[in-house]
């Protein structure tokens, strides 16, 4: 597909600086731009590339002011990154989608699957499954008995949904993700551990995306709940009975222990860990590798392990880096004090 700068600006409600008739048919990074491609500048850290890029069109924020001439045509918008996402979604939606059921797929007789869905080779859809419209189940995906799936969902290869779980509308489960496996529940019995049956389920609300090899465990009796708009990166672990609030995002290798309640609009950097049974307020930000062992009662940014307020962490880090010098100074002070004591004792 090919679009002119004029068409793109019209779609994005943007303005043009340059040739409105220049056309593009692909995307590129700003530092690797080629003629016929569109790129963007959202982070001014990369602003120096805009003067050398060979891309034909660059999306920029309305407040961007060039410091020297630019060869590319600029399309100015309110938010360049959000505008790029809109264009990428437009291209994605224009792609033809597979439909129908491949010959080696299995769909149980009691399952209800809309005629406009795609079910790939060796995919499995169990008894009593109810699947909405326009879903895509790629080869080797598994949807267990009595699972309910909304409209416009995508299950990539080897995505697994255990029995009785509920998936909302517009959800994406990437390859190897597992929804509804048993929670890590064992009762000590002498020197061994006895398994506690996990009889609950997982509820995934609308517009949730689950990354590759991410796991969300079923609850003991009720539901593990991932609320609307949550985005989980690859290799995230959500334990049983957890509740994750709306529009919270988690980067790779985050681990949430059992019965944690996470608020709305929280942000988790990579490898953050939360201890079990704690509550997190709305709008909390966790820096990478933060270790959280107690409730977070108000919106804040936390760093470190155990996690503390970001400003205090930065001050502590600055002091930590100076510890060798402080240690040497302290040693010198101690020696001087001892010398003074000796001189005083002589008097």
From Swiss-Prot:
Gene Ontology MF term list: N-acyltransferase activity
Cellular component GO terms held in the UniProt record: membrane
Alphabetical list of InterPro entries matching this protein: Hexapep, LpxD, Trimer_LpxA-like_sf, UDP_GlcNAc_AcTrfase_non-rep
A GO biological-process term: lipid A biosynthetic process
Entry keyword annotation includes Lipid biosynthesis: yes
Annotated Pfam families: Hexapep, LpxD
Pathway field: Bacterial outer membrane biogenesis; LPS lipid A biosynthesis
Domain of life: Bacteria
Catalytic activity reported: a UDP-3-O-[(3R)-3-hydroxyacyl]-alpha-D-glucosamine + a (3R)-hydroxyacyl-[ACP] = a UDP-2-N,3-O-bis[(3R)-3-hydroxyacyl]-alpha-D-glucosamine + holo-[ACP] + H(+)
Enzyme nomenclature, EC number: 2.3.1.191
Keywords from the UniProt entry: Acyltransferase, Lipid A biosynthesis, Lipid biosynthesis, Lipid metabolism, Repeat, Transferase
Protein purpose: Catalyzes the N-acylation of UDP-3-O-acylglucosamine using 3-hydroxyacyl-ACP as the acyl donor. Is involved in the biosynthesis of lipid A, a phosphorylated glycolipid that anchors the lipopolysaccharide to the outer membrane of the cell.
Family: Belongs to the transferase hexapeptide repeat family. LpxD subfamily.
Protein name: UDP-3-O-acylglucosamine N-acyltransferase
UniProt source species: Parabacteroides distasonis (strain ATCC 8503 / DSM 20701 / CIP 104284 / JCM 5825 / NCTC 11152)
Organismal lineage: Bacteria, Pseudomonadati, Bacteroidota, Bacteroidia, Bacteroidales
């Amino acid at each position: 597909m090919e679009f002119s700068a004029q068409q793109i600006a019209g779609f994005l409600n943007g303005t043009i600086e340059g040739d409105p008739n220049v056309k593009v048919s692909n995307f590129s990074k700003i530092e690797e731009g080629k003629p016929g491609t569109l790129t963007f500048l959202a982070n001014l850290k990369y602003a120096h590339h805009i003067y050398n890029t060979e891309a034909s069109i660059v999306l920029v924020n309305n407040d961007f002011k060039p410091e020297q001439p630019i060869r590319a045509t600029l399309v100015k918008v309110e938010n360049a990154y959000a505008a790029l996402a809109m264009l990428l979604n437009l291209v994605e939606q224009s792609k033809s989608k597979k439909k129908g059921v491949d010959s080696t797929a299995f769909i149980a007789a009691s399952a209800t699957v809309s005629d406009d869905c795609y079910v790939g080779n060796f995919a499995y859809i169990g008894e009593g499954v109810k699947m909405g419209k326009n879903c895509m189940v790629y080869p080797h995906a598994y949807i267990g008995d009595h699972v309910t799936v909304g409209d416009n969902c995508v299950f990539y290869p080897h995505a697994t949904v255990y029995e009785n779980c509920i998936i909302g509308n517009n959800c994406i489960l990437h390859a190897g993700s597992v929804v509804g496996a048993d929670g890590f529940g064992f009762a000590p019995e002498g020197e061994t551990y006895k398994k506690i049956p996990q009889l609950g389920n997982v509820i995934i609300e609308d517009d949730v995306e689950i990354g590759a090899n991410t796991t969300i465990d079923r609850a003991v009796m009720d539901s593990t709940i991932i609320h609307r708009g949550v985005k989980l990166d690859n290799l995230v672990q959500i334990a049983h009975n957890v509740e994750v609030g709306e529009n919270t995002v988690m980067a790779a290798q985050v681990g949430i222990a059992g019965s944690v309640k996470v608020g709305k609009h929280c942000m988790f950097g990579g490898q953050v860990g939360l201890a079990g049974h704690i509550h997190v307020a709305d709008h909390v930000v966790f820096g990478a590798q933060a270790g959280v062992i107690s409730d977070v009662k108000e919106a804040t940014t936390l760093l470190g392990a155990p996690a503390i307020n970001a400003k205090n962490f930065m001050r502590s880090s600055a002091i930590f880096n100076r510890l060798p010098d402080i240690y040497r100074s302290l040693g010198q002070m101690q020696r001087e004090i001892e010398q003074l004591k000796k001189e005083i004792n002589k008097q």
